[in-house]
UniProtKB/Swiss-Prot annotation:
This is Putative phosphoesterase SSP1770. One of its GO terms (molecular function) is hydrolase activity, acting on ester bonds. PANTHER family: PHOSPHOESTERASE SAOUHSC_00951-RELATED, PHOSPHOESTERASE YJCG-RELATED. It comes from Staphylococcus saprophyticus subsp. saprophyticus (strain ATCC 15305 / DSM 20229 / NCIMB 8711 / NCTC 7292 / S-41). Disulfide bonds: none annotated. Signal peptide: none annotated.
Length: 169
């Protein structure tokens, strides 16, 4: 079973992000807008209940998370991915570190950059054109996320789905 942990925003913000993703993100149909807290990891099906209990214990005392998407940014030249940057807060970083310090299915592959992906799989020309437009348009969105979502990859439908939500304190 392939799992991951994510913060999923409100439907209103998902709709705003998806307005861009529909046009610019090849993975639009496979996963909802989210901030990755723990990248994908594999477990044996028999370990699922243990994983759920570990998640519950690791989020104890972590409050709801205020997010503020502040601007369009990118991961160039490493990859032509454009995203809405989310201000890194102490609480957001604490939650990320709880699941990426090596005692829960390894460490993160990359430095934590909280964001919502809006465009990927672009040619260099597409990247330049789209990034220029998005940078000018800007974004200033705030909301509080109250749950951490355990997501799984449904291999039959080839998409990520929410398996369970965990309330933050």
């Amino acid at each position: 079973m392939i799992l991951g942990l994510a913060l999923i925003p409100s439907k209103a913000f998902q709709d705003e992000v998806n307005a861009y993703r529909k046009r610019y993100d090849a993975h639009y149909a496979t996963i909802m807008p989210h901030i990755t807290i723990k990248g994908q990891f594999k477990i044996n099906d028999g370990d699922l209940e243990s994983v759920k209990e570990t998640i519950k214990s690791k989020i104890e005392g972590i409050p709801t998370i205020d997010i503020h998407a502040t601007k369009a940014s990118n991961f160039a030249p490493i990859t032509n991915v454009i995203y809405f940057k989310v201000e890194k807060t102490e609480t957001l970083e604490r939650l990320f570190n709880q699941f990426n310090n090596g005692d829960f299915y390894g460490v993160a592959d990359h430095t934590f950059v909280p964001h919502f992906t809006i465009a990927q799989g672009l040619t260099s020309q597409e990247f330049e054109d789209i990034y220029g437009q998005l940078k000018l348009a800007g974004i200033d969105y705030k909301e509080t996320i109250e749950q951490l979502s355990l997501v799984y990859y449904d291999e039959k439908e080839e998409k990520w789905k929410v398996l369970e939500n965990y309330n933050l304190a």
